[in-house]
Amino acid sequence: MEPVDPRLEPWNHPGSQPKTACNKCYCKKCCYHCMCCFTKKGLGISYGRKKRSQRRRPPKSSKDHQDPIPEQPLSRQQPGDQTGQKKQKKALEGKTEADPCD
């Protein structure tokens, strides 16, 4: 082995770069071509921009599989209903006044 110049970065050492250029082939030989090919092709890691995936939409002719909720009449009193509370207070006052037990 030849002595390596210590001032060179490891990626610039002789023999660190492959003699052939990288290509788009995904065969086993090309996946192990160099470190860059191995990470991109072999491991599937790419740091580029990712495309937006299109959301699958149902065909326009199909209906929603949800039935509308039928309207139901309100049978209970609402918490903000003041007339119902006044009626209840008057009824209670009338009952307490009617007791002659005092």
Curated annotation (Swiss-Prot):
Modified residues (Asymmetric dimethylarginine): 52
N6-acetyllysine, modified sites: 28, 50-51
Name assigned to this protein: Protein Tat
Organism per entry: Human immunodeficiency virus type 1 group N (isolate YBF106) (HIV-1)
Species classification: Viruses, Riboviria, Pararnavirae, Artverviricota, Revtraviricetes
GO molecular-function term, one example from the UniProt record: trans-activation response element binding
Domain notes: The cell attachment site mediates the interaction with ITGAV/ITGB3 and ITGA5/ITGB1 integrins, leading to vascular cell migration and invasion. This interaction also provides endothelial cells with the adhesion signal they require to grow in response to mitogens. The Cys-rich region may bind 2 zinc ions. This region is involved in binding to KAT5.
Record-listed Zn(2+) 1 binding positions: 22, 33-34, 37
UniProt region (Core), positions on chain: 38-48
